[in-house]
Every structure is written in C-alpha cells, then in structure tokens.
Amino acid sequence: MIWNDHSDLRGCHAFLSPSQSRWLRYDMEKLEQVYLNMQAKERGTKIHELASQLIEFGIGLPKNHKTLNMFVNDAIGYGMESERVLYYSANCFGTADAISYSEKFKRVRIHDLKSGLIPAKMDQLAVYAALFCLEYNKKPKDLEIIMRIYQFDDILEERPESDYIDEIIDQIVISDKTLNKIGGR
C-alpha cells in the first residue's frame, strides 16, 4: 500500500476526530455550538498572547473602556508581570495573566483577562493569591491583596479577607498531600 502523505498533520487533531468521537451523537445545532465554543477558546488564547506581548514590551493601547485595552494599560501602569507561573507543587500550579508584588507596601495585585461569554468568578484569582503566598512564604494577613477581573468592558475588583486565602492555602496543602499519598505527582 502506498499511503497518502499527511506528515504535516502529525500532532494535530481534527474537530471531527475519531479519538474524540462524542460528536457522533450531536445534532447539527449542538455541533455548531461546540465548534463555535472551540473557536472562541482559540480566539481567547490569541487575545491573551497579544496582551502578554503588549505588556512585556510596555506598549499601551488607546485609553477607552474596552476589556483588552483596560487590562493591558492597567498591567503596564501597575508595573505587572505577564503570564507568571505560580507554583506550589506538580499537583498545584497555574499561570496568572498579570501579577505584581510590592515589598514596600506589602501589596500583591492579580489581574485576569476574560474574553469568554460566561461571567467569571474570583475563585481563580484567590487560588493564585494562595499560590503566591505558598511559593514566596508570605502570610495573607500581612498583605493587601487586590484581585481584578477584566471582562465585558468592565472591571470587577475584590480585596479578599486573609482568612479566605488561608482557607484556600489549607485546601491546597491537604489536597496535595492526599494526591501524593495516592500516587499523584
């Protein structure tokens, strides 16, 4: 047999992939919905990459009330790092869209850019705050923690109580120990 050459597709996955065959049970409306969601996710990834590069190079955007512009301009204005990995263990780590820490003011600022249609929750940012405390040996009660979500051309801001971050820290530590006992990383 002389096989057709598709070497350029190695490592790629088709939307109608045999290994992800649940699409066989979709009606055309569901197929369309899942496909559009996948495209939105890919668009969100590209927007995050663009935002990260703009922040890294200090290139601001026009000042207006557009989500991307506010996120990029605020991150640059607050001297934030883009796409910073926060690590506790192989079982628990994540990448903050933008983060900064001021030793002088004992302030950690965590910003998250959301491009999806589902309203975001602050839980993700609170976990980043907990990871920051664990990795850099900081106590939440000694910090001012500012968390912001940029979505729908708006900014949501919370300043969590230290007890809440302590609870997340405890949950991370306990969950990590449990996973390690049962053969996690």
Task: State each model region's role.
Residues 1-50:
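Charged, glycine-rich intrinsically disordered N-terminal tails and low-complexity linkers that flank
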Residues 33-109, 116-123, 135-142, 156-160, ...:
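Catalytic cores of nuclease domains that cleave nucleic-acid phosphodiester backbones
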Residues 114-116, 151-152:
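Short, solvent-exposed aromatic-acidic interface loops
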Residues 145-146:
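A beta-hairpin/wing motif
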Residues 149-157:
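Short, conserved secondary-structure transition motifs
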Residues 177-185:
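Accessory terminal regions of nucleic-acid processing enzymes
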